[in-house]
Design a protein with these regions (language model features):
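A long-range scaffold signal marking pre-active-site subdomains of enzyme folds
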Residues: 1-90, 109, 114, 124, ...
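Extended terminal and domain-junction accessory segments
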Residues: 1-27, 134-164, 238-379, 424-431, ...
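N-terminal edge beta-strand
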Residues: 33-54, 186-198, 339-366
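Extracytoplasmic copper-binding redox domains, predominantly the cupredoxin/blue-copper superfamily
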Residues: 34-35, 64, 68-98, 162, ...
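Extracytoplasmic beta-sandwich strand-turn segments characteristic of Greek-key/jelly-roll folds
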Residues: 44, 48-55, 61, 79-115, ...
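Structural beta-strand segments of beta-rich domains
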Residues: 59-61, 204-208, 365-367
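Histidine- and aromatic-rich segments of cupredoxin/plastocyanin-like copper-binding domains
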Residues: 89-101, 167-313
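Long, hydrophobic, well-ordered secondary-structure blocks that form the structural core
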Residues: 100-150
Length: 475
């Protein structure tokens, strides 16, 4: 089986001078994950993963999401909220958990596309994020820089790799088993919706945009033949220079851009992409295999070396880190823990249901945030909306890795670890979320709000979902 993609890269309804317009229906569909057995999925445009949106840097997009999902097996309405993960969106378009779209409603989201990176869109509806995403509500969204260095692989050699895992019953039904509101681990690894696929690759360099869209599972990626992975980008764009690593840890919500060069392999060579077990994740023999690359064809005439400096803007992360540290106005600490009496996951002992704010930096303020794993035997991938951050330190067994030293919005916090990050807050004022991206933890209720500045647009009332019917004008 070969890697396949849900749709072509450009499927917008129409364009104008600076905006691309899309319409996506959230609806039930079916997929053949087990041979000859149909599995019900909930997908954007009825597909898993959803349509790949490929945007040019600097062109705004408007995406109309229509909720046609109806009810679940317990006759509960399947409400949604869409978050474009990695976008500096205005509060009303950021996927605030309580800004829900019910079945029969739609909402138009406006995205700025002002940074070139591998993003993804997924459900963020309050207390339904995990099950909605597990059923399939996730898709890739790439913002490309037309002026990027030409020696970085492009076109057919620029490949999104959407990772997820599923547990299926014998009849093909997706089994959501959250271990007492702790985690969901499947025994089937999917790449772009396909279980353990094979991909034919030419004898040249490929850029793989890895995106972990799972619920709880992290991966420690490696090539079966021992060849190093060359990391060129993090969550929020290119690193300054390529970084080689033998293993690459990728938690839920994280993205890494990796170059693999197949030039020195003869046609017929097979190379497996594997994963080491992650501490405290439920592992199966089947989850140690991800996919296989099958080398085909003769030598490729044009296979230039990767540039030593990846970014055309000359951005210096070390200088930026020092500049931010010289402007720090305050430090904050956030302890991610577990209230076993209430069966809730907490941030500083509070939950989403408690309301209020966990922080209120002003627009332009530079702060250091310390994330503390409160223990209990779990790792937490911590996601902060709106801003890109730079990691400063991680204690315990696994120190900061060189491939993590770019702009990021998700930080993998190992069991018992503390992480320090620094960021300048903005560009928008308003309320945003931070949470654990183990989506079971998020739903039960490890998520808190912070507000940048004062007086920003309300994330719920400014642009609420509206009824969708035949009288709604098209985009």
């Amino acid at each position: 089986m070969r890697v396949t993609f849900a749709t072509s890269r450009r499927f917008y309804q129409f364009v104008d001078s600076n905006t691309d317009y899309y319409e996506i229906r959230m609806q039930k569909g079916s997929a053949e994950i087990l041979p000859n057995i149909q599995t019900e999925i909930w997908g954007y445009s009825g597909m898993v993963p959803g349509p790949l949106i490929y945007q040019q840097l600097g062109r705004q997009s408007v995406v109309r999401f229509i909720n046609n999902l109806g009810t679940d097996s317990q006759n509960r309405k399947i409400h949604t909220s869409v978050h474009l993960h990695g976008s500096a969106s205005l509060p009303q378009y950021d996927g605030w958990a309580d800004d829900i779209t019910n079945p029969g409603q739609y909402k138009d989201y406006i995205f700025p596309n002002n940074r070139a990176a591998t993003l993804w869109y997924h459900d963020h509806g309050v207390h339904r994020t995990a099950v909605n995403a597990y059923m399939g509500l996730a898709g890739n969204y790439i913002v490309a820089d037309p002026n990027e260095n030409p020696n970085i692989p492009k076109g057919e050699f620029d490949v999104p790799v959407v990772l997820s895992d599923k547990l299926l019953a014998r009849n093909g039904r997706i089994v959501y088993a959250d271990s007492g509101e702790k985690d969901v681990f499947g025994d089937i690894v999917l790449v772009n919706g396909v279980p353990w696929p094979r991909m034919a690759v030419k004898r040249t360099k490929y850029r793989f945009r890895f995106c972990n869209t799972g619920i709880s599972r992290a991966y420690i990626l490696k090539l079966g033949n021992g060849q190093p992975l060359t990391v060129i980008g993090t969550d929020a764009g290119l690193l300054p220079s390529p970084v080689q690593t033998n293993i690459l840890t990728i938690g839920v919500g994280e993205r890494y851009e990796v170059v693999i060069d197949f030039a020195n392999y003869s046609a017929g060579t097979q190379i497996e992409l594997l994963s080491n077990d992650v501490l405290n994740d439920t592992a199966f023999a089947s989850t140690r295999k991800i996919m296989r690359f099958d080398v085909v064809g003769g030598a490729v005439s044009y296979n230039p070396p990767l540039p030593s400096f990846l970014r055309n803007d000359g951005f210096d992360f070390n200088r930026k880190r020092q500049e931010l540290l010289s402007r720090v106005v305050r430090r904050r600490e956030f302890v991610f823990g577990r209230d076993n009496l209430q069966s809730q996951w907490t941030v500083n002992g509070r939950t989403w249901a408690n309301g209020g704010l966990e922080a209120n930096p002003q627009v332009g303020d530079v702060e250091i945030w310390k994330f503390v794993n409160g223990g209990g035997g779990w790792h937490h991938p911590i996601h902060v909306h709106l801003v890109d951050m730079l990691i400063l330190s991680r204690n315990k067994r696994r120190r900061v890795q060189p491939y993590e030293l770019g702009w990021k919005d998700v930080f993998f916090m190992d069991e018992g670890a503390d992480i320090e990050v620094v960021a300048q807050f903005g560009p928008h004022s308003g309320k945003y979320m931070m949470h654990c991206h183990n989506l079971v933890h998020e739903d039960h209720d490890m998520m808190r709000a912070f507000e940048v500045g004062q007086g920003g647009p309300d994330p719920v009332t400014t642009a609420p979902a509206k009824p969708y019917n035949s009288s709604v004008p098209p985009l």
